[in-house]
Design a protein with these regions (language model features):
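N-terminal amphipathic alpha-helix/helix-capping segment at the start of soluble metabolic enzymes
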Residues: 1-14, 235-243
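N-terminal beta1-alpha1 ligand-phosphate binding loop
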Residues: 12-24, 28, 36
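Alpha-helical segments flanking ligand/cofactor-binding loops in enzyme cores
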Residues: 23, 76-77, 184, 218
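Structural motif
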Residues: 28, 81-82, 138, 189-194
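Glycine-rich phosphate-binding active-site loops on the catalytic face of alpha/beta enzymes
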Residues: 30-42, 88-94, 148-149, 154, ...
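Conserved anion-binding
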Residues: 36-42, 48-49, 54-182
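C-terminal helical cap(s) of enzyme catalytic domains, especially alpha/beta-barrels
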Residues: 47-57, 98-100, 187, 202, ...
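A C-terminal functional module that forms or caps the active site or interfaces directly
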Residues: 173-192, 206
């Protein structure tokens, strides 16, 4: 019997600001690195600086530019400097806004945190309809799941993974409070719910905001690979709570 195909979890290290952190992500085996184009973020870099850092990337590692309600002129100027960039929209952008950039993109979904909310039901955390959201942004290459906190970005918080819908017809990127210690559990809970799964980490591999730890990056990547190996060998370890 031919064994079932396995899926390697793709990894993005986000919020990079330094050459050594880009190099550490590459050496650890990350698939993508993220540069924050949102000026109020402590991890903000200019488009010019992002272009300098992106030039360190070898082939087949993707630079991702994160925007929050940015004007079209800012997006196009950044894309001109980094022609291979993939876009991440993390604000209040509409499907039309995302498509107007004319580049491959993923769209962040802000998942409510409140574990005790009366609106929390299986498949609808905090009343948020992820299935509809994914359909609304069906042109996106992926939907990134982040915790809904004040402002934009997940603030290093995790949401309740067990409340996600059991079947989302989309490529998902799990984000929000991931660390080397919890990413195995996150992958095991979320992967069976979607088409494919990737993970995105920022604060979980930092020394301070915008300053990454090479050791933590290596630990995170190793944990993701351990999750892949565990699920390939023992699919019953994948945990999906009953509906």
């Amino acid at each position: 019997m031919t064994p079932a195909p396995t899926t390697r979890t793709r990894i993005k290290i986000c919020g990079l600001t330094r050459e050594e952190d880009v190099d550490a992500a590459v050496e650890a085996g990350a698939d993508a690195v993220g540069f924050v184009m949102y000026e109020t973020s402590p991890r903000y870099v200019t488009a010019g600086r992002a272009a300098e850092l992106a030039r360190r990337l070898p082939p087949f590692i993707t630079p991702v530019l994160l925007f929050v309600n940015a004007p079209a002129t800012q997006i196009s100027a950044a894309c001109a400097l980094i022609p291979t960039a993939f876009l991440q929209f993390h604000g209040d952008e509409t499907p039309e806004d995302c498509l107007a950039a004319g580049r491959p993109f993923m769209r962040a979904a802000r998942i409510p945190l409140g574990e005790k909310s009366a609106e929390n039901t299986p498949g609808s955390p905090g009343g948020f309809d992820l299935v509809k959201y994914a359909q609304d942004f069906k042109a996106a290459q992926a939907i990134l799941l982040d915790a809904h906190v004040e402002g934009y970005g997940g603030g290093g918080k995790t949401f309740n993974w067990s409340l996600l819908p059991p079947n989302v017809s989309a490529h998902l990127v799990l984000s929000g409070g991931l660390t080397p210690a919890n990413v195995i559990d996150g992958i095991s809970q979320v992967r069976p719910r979607c088409t494919t799964l990737a993970v995105d980490v920022s604060s979980g591999v930092e020394i301070s905001k915008g300053i990454k730890s090479a050791d933590k990056i290596n630990q995170f990547v190793a944990a993701v690979r351990a999750a892949d190996e565990l699920l390939a060998k023992s699919p019953h370890h994948v945990r999906v709570p009953p509906a």
